Swiss-Prot record:
It holds the Pfam family CBFD_NFYB_HMF. It is found in: Nucleus. This is Nuclear transcription factor Y subunit beta. One of its GO terms (molecular function) is DNA-binding transcription activator activity, RNA polymerase II-specific. The keyword Cytoplasm does not apply. Residues 84-95 are annotated as: Subunit association domain (SAD). It comes from Gallus gallus. SUPFAM superfamilies: Histone-fold (SSF47113). Residues 57-63 bind DNA. Heterotrimeric transcription factor composed of three components, NF-YA, NF-YB and NF-YC. NF-YB and NF-YC must interact and dimerize for NF-YA association and DNA binding. InterPro entries: CBFA_NFYB_domain, Histone-fold, Transc_fact_NFYB/HAP3, Transcrpt_fac_NFYB/HAP3_CS. Residues 51-140 are annotated as: B domain.
Length: 205
């Protein structure tokens, strides 16, 4: 799905402002079946310019997660934090892009959990699929009909959340149950699911 090919603005058509202001109209082709990949476009049809840091996860959050994997006395250089920050953002874009392709093929606008699992399997991250599938099932069972923090949580194929920033600051307990039944002490950060009873963290290999 090429975002640039889905819009046509006046400058591309070579039409002056006076012409548009008259009784004539410029028709912009838009496929309603496409997802909202171009939501960041402004009213003129041109893409907004973003600072490089705007597309990354907050580096403080990335650093906090990294620090959990090293001894308390350990330190992490700034360039290492920035490197992981960029890698994580690229990974998210990589997975989401593949999931978005599936949505486009099936003429849907909303990426759901199954799309993410399908994308991870397609891109070779098979070892993550089964644990995530179990977690997604537990999550949906626990959140069914409940109110999420800061807004409504709906379940099913159109699973969506409106969560406040506070929801991303909590973490699950350290005891994890792996797919082979072994318990390990590994910290995994996620959204605020402390309130969900019966949800267990899963160790990824």
């Amino acid at each position: 799905m090429d975002g640039d090919s889905s819009t046509t603005d006046a400058s591309q058509l070579g039409i002056a402002g006076d012409y548009i202001g008259g009784s004539h109209y410029v028709i912009q082709p838009h496929d309603d079946t496409e997802d909202s990949m171009n939501d960041h476009e402004d009213t003129n049809g041109s893409k907004e310019s973003f600072r490089e840091q705007d597309i990354y996860l907050p580096i403080a959050n990335v650093a906090r997660i990294m620090k959990n994997a090293i001894p308390q006395t350990g330190k992490i250089a700034k360039d290492a934090k920035e490197c992981v920050q960029e890698c994580v953002s690229e990974f998210i874009s990589f997975i989401t892009s593949e999931a978005s392709e599936r949505c486009h093929q099936e003429k849907r606008k909303t990426i759901n959990g199954e799309d993410i699992l399908f994308a991870m399997s397609t891109l070779g991250f098979d070892s993550y699929v089964e644990p995530l599938k179990l977690y997604l099932q537990k999550f949906r069972e626990a959140m069914k009909g409940e109110k999420g923090i800061g807004g409504t949580v709906t379940t099913g194929d159109g699973l969506s959340e409106e969560l406040t920033e506070e929801a991303f600051t909590n973490q699950l307990p350290a005891g994890l149950i792996t797919t082979d039944g072994q318990q390990q002490n590994v910290m995994v950060y996620t959204t605020s699911y402390q309130q969900i009873s019966g949800v267990q963290q899963i160790q990824f290999s």
